[in-house]
A protein has these predicted regions:
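Eukaryotic scaffold repeat domains enriched in small/polar residues
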Residues: 19-379
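C-terminal motif of bacterial Sec signal peptides marking the signal peptidase cleavage site
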Residues: 15-16
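Bacterial N-terminal signal peptides that target proteins for export
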Residues: 1-6
Length: 379
């Protein structure tokens, strides 16, 4: 069934680890709006691995901005390369493919992808339960599913060159229509049990502003908007990320509102998780807080998915959030910059099966690995 996109609503990875161990810092989480109190639990701590990935990257490859990333069951990392390289740099390097696959040690396995077929502004990817790689290019109106090695396009949802707009072009008005065509899609996830496909559709103003759900063949099923109160109706709804939790919930980055919104799988609103920040330098006379605190997210891989790992572009760090209470417990990263452990416009995040966190940077044009620091047994 479809929930109407009401005008008032105006629409609308990382991780702990699977059987991993963490240094222990006990905490008692605060009570959220839903009066849930988190149990005392160890908070993971991370340190950058300066020797990952291995260099040279491929055959002296150079990347453009990295739009997103995802990880498969072998802990192979797939990185989305936008290929917007500095042209003079090509005198000393070769352009990398749009999709780069790395093994856990940081070696390049392969590069693949046709830039024209994939589309503009590669934004997010997801590896499903059958190891297929789903790719979202935000500048298009389509979603694509590839074999794990990228050799076969298994499914395309939406028509290339068309947008879900009033005139079918990128200049038209967004329609948020009941069909499987998109307008500036941002993120994708696939329900491992049902095969249903969840798409955050509308990563920039002027595009759609909805969560769309499709069946495993790509047929439209339902949609809903980001939640807005009457007082929030002027906050532009930009669903910038989307991930499905093990307990049947949908987590969406409500970028302009600096929070994560949680829904059930039919679109019923559950709660907000605010992601705050305080500028370290006075915002007087300069832009401040414009990038957003909730840009990308991933869950810890323990069965309860105790933590959320949230890319915060305002503080330029990764926030570790207690998923039950919504409390920001700690953060890692050394703020803006290009030294190891710093970030330049981080845009994608993922976690492997042993708890290593990977962060892809758009302006930094690199991916960094953060490993669990000085682990101790986790009860």
């Amino acid at each position: 069934m479809t929930r109407a996109l009401l005008p008032v609503l105006a629409s609308i990875l990382i991780v702990g680890c699977r059987n991993a161990s963490f240094p222990v810092e006990e905490h008692q989480a605060g009570v959220s709006g839903s009066d849930v109190v988190a149990d005392p639990a160890p908070i993971p701590h991370y340190e950058v691995d300066p020797k990952w990935p291995k260099l040279p990257l491929g055959d002296r490859w150079i990347t453009g901005g990295l739009g997103g990333m995802c990880i498969d069951e072998r802990d192979h990392i797939f990185v989305l390369n936008r290929q917007d390289v500095v042209l003079e740099d090509l005198d000393g390097a070769r352009p990398a493919a749009p999709v780069i696959e790395l093994d856990p040690e940081g070696n390049v396995v392969r590069g693949w992808g046709d830039p024209e077929r994939l589309g503009d502004r590669l934004h997010d990817c997801h590896v499903d339960a059958e190891s297929n790689v789903w790719i979202v290019a935000a500048g298009t109106g389509v979603l694509q599913k590839y074999s794990n090695d990228g050799r076969e396009l298994l499914l395309q949802i939406g028509e290339t060159g068309k947008y879900d707009s009033s005139d079918g072009t990128r200049e038209g008005e967004p329609q948020n229509s009941d069909r499987a065509q998109f307008f500036l899609p941002a993120a994708v996830d696939v329900d491992a049990q049902t095969g249903e496909i969840y798409v955050a559709d509308g990563e920039l103003p002027g595009g759609n502003h909805r969560i769309a759900v499709l069946d495993r063949e790509g047929r439209f099923l339902r949609q809903w908007a980001l939640e807005r109160t009457e007082a929030e109706r002027d906050v532009i709804p930009l669903p910038h990320c989307l991930r499905l939790s093990n307990d049947g919930l949908v987590y969406v980055c409500d970028r302009r509102a600096d929070r994560i919104q949680v829904f059930d799988r039919d679109g019923a609103f559950v709660r907000n998780i605010d992601i705050p920040f305080e500028p370290l330098t006075s915002p007087d006379g300069r832009p401040s807080g414009t990038r957003g605190t909730a840009v990308a997210l991933a869950f810890s891989t323990d069965p309860q998915q105790r933590y959320l790992f949230v890319v915060n572009q305002n503080s330029v760090m990764v926030d570790i959030v207690d998923r039950r209470s919504g409390e920001v417990l700690s953060s890692f990263g050394e703020g803006p910059g290009r030294y190891p452990g710093q970030f330049t416009l981080p845009h994608g995040i993922g976690v492997d099966s042993v708890g290593n966190v990977y962060v892809a940077e758009q302006e930094g044009r690199r991916i960094q690995k953060f490993r669990v620091a000085t682990p101790t047994p986790m009860n």
